[in-house]
C-alpha cells in the first residue's frame, strides 16, 4: 500500500498524507519532518534505516537576475531572499545529511546555482542531487566545476530514467 507525503497546500486525495512545516510523522520506521520552504509547499527531512535524506522541494535562494528594477530595489530584494533562504535552512544546522535533492534552476538566470553552492558549502551532504533543471543537463556539470573539490559528491543526471545507487559508509 503506497502512501504519498505532500505539503498541506494541496487538495485532500486518497493515499496522501498532508503535512505543514514543523510537523513530524513516522511511517513504517521512516521519520519524516516537514520543514520550511522559500516558495510554495515544504521541504522534507527523511530518516530511514540510518540514512538522512533531505528533499528541498521548491526551497531555494531565489536570487533572480535583475529585472526592470533599480539597483537599490534589486539589492533589497536580494537581501530579503537570502535571509528567507538561510532561515528556512536553519532547522538543518545539526543534521548530517547523506543525500540531498536540491533545485538548480536555470530559470533564475546566472544566479541559478547560488542556493546549491551555499547548501553544499554549509551542510556538506555526502551526495548532492540537483533537480528542477528540466533537461538542461549541462547545468549540473557547470555546478560541479564551480565547486571544484568538495566533500559532497554531485550526482549529475544525464538522461530521463537514469538510476543512481548510494551505499552509506
Give, region by region, the residue ranges found by the protein language model.
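Short, conserved loop/helix-junction motifs that constitute active-site signature segments
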Residues: 1, 93-95, 119-124
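Short, polar loop motifs at secondary-structure junctions
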Residues: 2-12, 20-23
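A structural micro-motif
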Residues: 2-3, 14, 30, 51, ...
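Active-site neighborhood of phospho(di)ester-bond hydrolases with catalytic His/Asp-centered motifs
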Residues: 3-9, 54-57, 76-80, 99-105, ...
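Active-site environment of divalent metal-dependent phosphoester hydrolases
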Residues: 11-14, 40-42, 61-65, 106-112, ...
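Core dinuclear metal-dependent hydrolase active-site scaffold
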Residues: 14-96, 160-169
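Binuclear metal-ion centers of metallo-dependent hydrolases, dominated by the metallo-beta-lactamase
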Residues: 16-23, 112-169
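A short, acidic, amphipathic alpha-helical segment used as a generic capping/interface helix at domain edges
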Residues: 84-90, 109-118
Amino acid at each position: 500500500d503506497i502512501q504519498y507525503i505532500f505539503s498541506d497546500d494541496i487538495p485532500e486525495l486518497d493515499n496522501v498524507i498532508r503535512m505543514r512545516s514543523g510537523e513530524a510523522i513516522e511511517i513504517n520506521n521512516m521519520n519524516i519532518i516537514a520543514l520550511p520552504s522559500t516558495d510554495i509547499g515544504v521541504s522534507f527531512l527523511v530518516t530511514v534505516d540510518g540514512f538522512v535524506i533531505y528533499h528541498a522541494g521548491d526551497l531555494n535562494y531565489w536570487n533572480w537576475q535583475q529585472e526592470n528594477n533599480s539597483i537599490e530595489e534589486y539589492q533589497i530584494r536580494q537581501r530579503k531572499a537570502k535571509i528567507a533562504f538561510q532561515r528556512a535552512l536553519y532547522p538543518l544546522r545539526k543534521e548530517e545529511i547523506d543525500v540531498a535533492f536540491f533545485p538548480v534552476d536555470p530559470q533564475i538566470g546566472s544566479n541559478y546555482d547560488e542556493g546549491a553552492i551555499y547548501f553544499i558549502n554549509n551542510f556538506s551532504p555526502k551526495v548532492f542531487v540537483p533537480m528542477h533543471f528540466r533537461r538542461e543537463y549541462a547545468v549540473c556539470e557547470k555546478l560541479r566545476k564551480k565547486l571544484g573539490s568538495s566533500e559532497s559528491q554531485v550526482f549529475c543526471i544525464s538522461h530521463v530514467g537514469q538510476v543512481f545507487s548510494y551505499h552509506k559508509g
